[in-house]
Amino acid sequence: MASPALAAALLAAEGPNASGAGEGGGGVNASGAVWGPPPSQYSAGAVAGLAAVVGFLIVFTVVGNVLVVIAVLTSRALRAPQNLFLVSLASADILVATLVMPFSLANELMAYWYFGQVWCGVYLALDVLFCTSSIVHLCAISLDRYWSVTQAVEYNLKRTPRRVKATIVAVWLISAIISFPPLVSFYRQPDGAAYPRCGLNDETWYILSSCIGSFFAPCLIMGLVYARIYRVAKLRTRTLSEKRGPAGPEGESPTTENGLGAAAAAAAGENGHCAPPRADVEPDESSAAERRRRRGALRRGARQREAGVEAPGPGLGSAAADPGALSVSRSPGPGGRLSRASSRSVEFFLSRRRRARSSVCRRKVAQAREKRFTFVLAVVMGVFVLCWFPFFFSYSLYGICREACQLPTPLFKFFFWIGYCNSSLNPVIYTIFNQDFRRSFKHILFRRRRRGFRQ
């Protein structure tokens, strides 16, 4: 909703004679003189530069969000129901880039509204609808993450594709309710003005209500939700630190979703998949170490058989370290046969030791994942506030104290274009930090390119 709000603020600053009701480039003032299109406030070089920058922003927004949609719909790793939020969010940002930003750019460069009053009303409603929908989607995603952290088991059972789609419909309905007033209350231009303009209702009640509904209320909800998530993460990190040490008799640990302090779920990767083996150990190195352990076990078993020592029981050391040692110590020979009870003890000790190692690994993965998750939340909140807060704060101040609180026009324009940048940054925030999206992007872009080269 930035561009119509900018037009309304500029109309108030320029006075009533700056507005017009014409359809196109000309108008007639109160004295009956015919005016042509107003002179542009930018030089030819500035027009070309601004058009290039905004054009790149539009293309980047469309391409990035289209990649998000394709990745979620085609990648098996991204078919979780909650990723439908990202599809809907990307769709809203694509619509902002295609149906709002080009007309905002034309209105800015030409210094008047060229496209007529009918499209002006539609344009105002679409602007508010898509931008508000983008913000409300971020709010819905934050609530989804909060419930998945605090009510992992119950919420996972409830979070079906049908429920997620119903939530998405509710998001669009809320955005439509907020954006509907511009269709019936957009700025009414006075008769006899020189140039046509397109702006929202300039009354204080509309400015404040739209700012609260489109920004401040969702921002407050997101702040409270992310603060709660951060507190839960800190609490579980502290709990893990206190419990650090040897695992219990069964090697068990608490489990939750999303890796926030859960030992079992923390073994999952960045997107809930099982964590791969250690990446710093190559297969050849692992097999070589395995062969060395087996040779050592063979030598120890041979020495035990020569000495006539019976294989140990539950306190087994070398055999417990490797299944290979167990197979050797079971080989026939004087004093070298394990009893059935000793064999069960060895198997129990081996499984217990494997669980203990797995528990320690899961603790480390959980702590690392909590830090990464907290960082992503900080990026989401920081970019969201950075993009939208300056515009909505200055716009609401203008609605309260008018000219006394009005910012310089160039600064106000900069604030509202920064708000549009949020649509292009959403794919970066929600995908670049995600390995599955990175792999899917590479698969989409480079595999098709290779096919083109082969053909």
From Swiss-Prot:
InterPro entries in alphabetical order: ADR_fam (IPR002233), ADRA2C_rcpt (IPR000735), GPCR_Rhodpsn (IPR000276), GPCR_Rhodpsn_7TM (IPR017452)
Membrane topology term: Multi-pass membrane protein
TM segment ranges: 48-72, 85-110, 121-143, 165-187, 204-227, 377-400, 414-434
Implicated in catechol agonist binding and receptor activation (site feature) positions: S210, S214
Pfam families according to UniProt: 7tm_1
Glycosylation sites: N17, N29
Residue span of region Disordered: 241-340
Topological domains annotated Extracellular: 1-47, 111-120, 188-203, 401-413
Site (Implicated in ligand binding): D127
Stretches assigned to the Cytoplasmic side: 73-84, 144-164, 228-376, 435-455
Biased composition (Basic residues): 291-302
Cell location: Cell membrane
CDD domains: 7tmA_alpha2C_AR
GO terms of biological process kind: platelet activation; regulation of smooth muscle contraction; regulation of vasoconstriction
Keywords noted in UniProt: Cell membrane, Disulfide bond, G-protein coupled receptor, Glycoprotein, Membrane, Receptor, Transducer, Transmembrane, Transmembrane helix
Main location: membrane
Gene Ontology CC, one term: plasma membrane
Disulphide-bonded residues: C120-C198
GO MF terms held by the record: alpha2-adrenergic receptor activity; epinephrine binding
Family: Belongs to the G-protein coupled receptor 1 family. Adrenergic receptor subfamily. ADRA2C sub-subfamily.
Function as written in the Swiss-Prot or TrEMBL entry: Alpha-2 adrenergic receptors mediate the catecholamine-induced inhibition of adenylate cyclase through the action of G proteins.
Name of the protein in question: Alpha-2C adrenergic receptor
Species lineage: Eukaryota, Metazoa, Chordata, Craniata, Vertebrata
Name of the gene encoding the protein in the UniProt record: ADRA2C
